[in-house]
From Swiss-Prot:
Name of the protein this chain belongs to: Large ribosomal subunit protein uL23cz/uL23cy
UniProt subcellular location: Plastid, Chloroplast
PROSITE patterns the UniProt entry points to: RIBOSOMAL_L23
Coiled coil: none
Gene (UniProt): rpl23-A
Role noted for this protein: Binds to 23S rRNA.
Quaternary state and interactors: Part of the 50S ribosomal subunit.
Example GO molecular function: rRNA binding
Gene3D superfamilies to which the protein is assigned, alphabetical: 3.30.70.330
């Protein structure tokens, strides 16, 4: 579970759930094969395809000092029909 940070819930990612595609942010140093192996092992599913893209870090400013956050990678994981991943929503109190 080292590679996957958290699941992403945006309008597009919720729409992709209908196509059996799950979206999550992963560590920027992780490879596609590592993430695929981990998802298949942990959730017991079969992965058909994985698409990834790297999102740039956002600019931040504290007084006169300018900086930016770290970039991260987002994966869209497509599963075989009949398989699904349980919801990854944490309960907030």
């Amino acid at each position: 579970m080292d590679g996957i940070k958290y699941a992403v819930f945006t309008e597009k990612s919720i729409r992709l759930l209908g196509n059996n595609q799950y979206t999550s942010n992963v560590e920027s140093g992780s490879t596609r094969t590592e993430i695929k192996h981990w998802v298949e092992l942990f959730f017991g599913v079969k992965v058909i395809a994985m698409n990834s893209h790297r999102l740039p870090g956002k600019g931040r400013r504290v007084g006169p000092i300018k900086g930016h956050t770290m970039h991260y990678r987002r994966m869209i994981i497509t599963l075989q029909p009949g398989y699904s991943i349980p919801p990854l929503i944490e309960k907030r109190t």
